[in-house]
Structure formats: structure tokens, C-alpha cells
């Protein structure tokens, strides 16, 4: 069961990255003329015109020292170091538990700091958006609407992909699923957090969709951590849009590097409001895009966070439904009819 759940999560993550990339190239949001208005440092824009080959991407994964990846926020090199340290921890015996506890404590510390800082995002958002509008005029509003519209299309396309997977893999009509889960989707939209949505998703799985506890007790909490399809769409569309605005050339090597970074960031993103903005700043640094463009996104991030959480949760529940059907333990009466099934009586 665990293998099926993880396999489905990896499939939908890949589809989210590929579909959002295609949607970006179709609509191509972002006006390059905004770059000179978003930052006064013209040299920063000129120097950001880089081209990275696939060979360079692979070679540059290995850092020259242990300090440089942290100073440069090089995501691929940090991942390499994390894997290397993890392998080494497994070979040092009893000391590994001590170091593991230290790493977990540091992770909890920085996550708590992030949660505290997120509380100040509305103030920073107001100041940032006001500054950007005063500098750029109405052009920035049109660009923001174009990005929001493109992201919305990405979310709708992902919903269609979930329905298609339910039909093709689960051999179920997606109509009852959407009909039964729609009220919960609105709840998740209001919560704007994958972690906060765990309880309501579990309740929907059991009482509305007929998914047994042995499935959703694993798939929903796991999905809230590793299955972030909405976050993938967000990172790809806004990362590539800001790269286009600032004139950063997206070569094949950079696209490959971005895909890998998006995959890791989406898996590692905490399911709390505002976490997507933090991940986007990391991705922009990796792509050598000036962080001045964050101001374009901050004004919309509360709405974007709600849409991300809704898409993330929809993927988790769709996976639970398909796996339950494949295991032949899905309560079809509960899914297809509004009356309570024998399990609920």
C-alpha cells in the first residue's frame, strides 16, 4: 500500500511540473519591461543572463567545499551534502542518534522561526505591493493578473489530470468524487494549509468517499508532507515568469536543474501558510533571478496559498481513492450514494 501511495505521489508531482511548464510556454506571462522598474541595479539584470548546460548542471552538483553551498544557497549542492551526511551518519554507530537529535532540533527551531516571520508577511506584503505600484504604475497590476491567471489555469489543468487518473487507473467515474469532495475543498481553501487540512481530509475520506482508515491514515499525513502538486505548479510558473521578466535565459540545463529543485522544494516545504514564498525565494536564488521580483508575488500569496493547499489536498485524497480501489477495499456505496453505508451505521 505504501509503495502504491508513493508511486502515485511521484507520478502526480511529475505531471504537475510538466503540465505547468507547458502552460507557462503557452501563455508566457511576465513583461520583461518591468525588470528595469523592479530594480534600480541594471547591472544585476544584465549579469543574470546565464546559460547552463546539462553537463555543467551535473558536474556542479558536487561542491568544492562544505561552506560554499550554504553561502550561495546552491540547492543541488546542499542536497548532495545532505545525502552524503545521511550515508555517513549510518556508519558511525551510536553517535548518529546524537547528531540526528541535533539536526531535528535545528529543523524545529528554524521552522518555528519561519512560522513567526510568516505572521509579519501581511505588513511586508502591503509595503512591498505599494512600493512596486508606485514605482511601476498600472503595468505591474496587469502583470500580476497575468501570473495569477496562468497559475489558475495550472490548478484547473491539474484537477483535470486527477479526474483522468481516477478514470484510467482507478476505473471510477470522477463525478461522484468531485461532488462529494467539493465542500471539503472549500474548507481546505479557507484553511490555506496542507497540515491544517489533514483532519478534514481524513473525515471526508471516511464519511464521504468510503476510503478505509488503513489507507487514509497513511496517505493523508504523508501527502501533506511530500505530495505538493499545487506548490510545484506555483514554483514552476512564478519561477519561470520572474526569470522571463529579468531576462534570465532558461536553457535545457537550467530547466533540468529547476525541475530537480522544484521536486525537492515541494517535498521539503512545510505545510504552513507562507511556506511557498520561502521556497520560491530559494528557487529564484538557484536560478540566479534577482529577488526584487518577489514583490510581484507577495501581494497575491495569501490567495495563491489557498489555491496551493486546495490542489495539494485534492491530490492526496485522489491518491487515497485510487489506492483503496486497487486494494478492493473501497466502500462503493458510500462513494456513489448520499445515504450512509453499512460501515457508517
Residue spans of the language-model regions?
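Juxtamembrane helix-boundary/capping and inter-helix hinge elements in multi-pass membrane proteins
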Residues: 1, 32, 93-97, 105, ...
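Signature of multi-pass transmembrane helix bundles
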Residues: 4-176
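Hydrophobic transmembrane alpha-helical segments of multi-pass transport and channel proteins
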Residues: 10-14, 18, 152, 156, ...
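Transmembrane alpha-helix boundary and packing residues in multipass membrane permease domains
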Residues: 21, 83-87, 124-131, 163, ...
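Membrane-interfacial loop-to-helix junctions in multi-pass transporters
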Residues: 54, 73-77, 115-119, 153-154, ...
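Helix-loop-helix junctions within the multi-pass membrane cores of secondary transporters/permeases
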Residues: 184-266, 332-333
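Hydrophobic alpha-helical transmembrane segments of membrane transport and translocation systems
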Residues: 274-336
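Conserved small/polar residues in nucleotide/adenosyl-binding loops
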Residues: 337-344
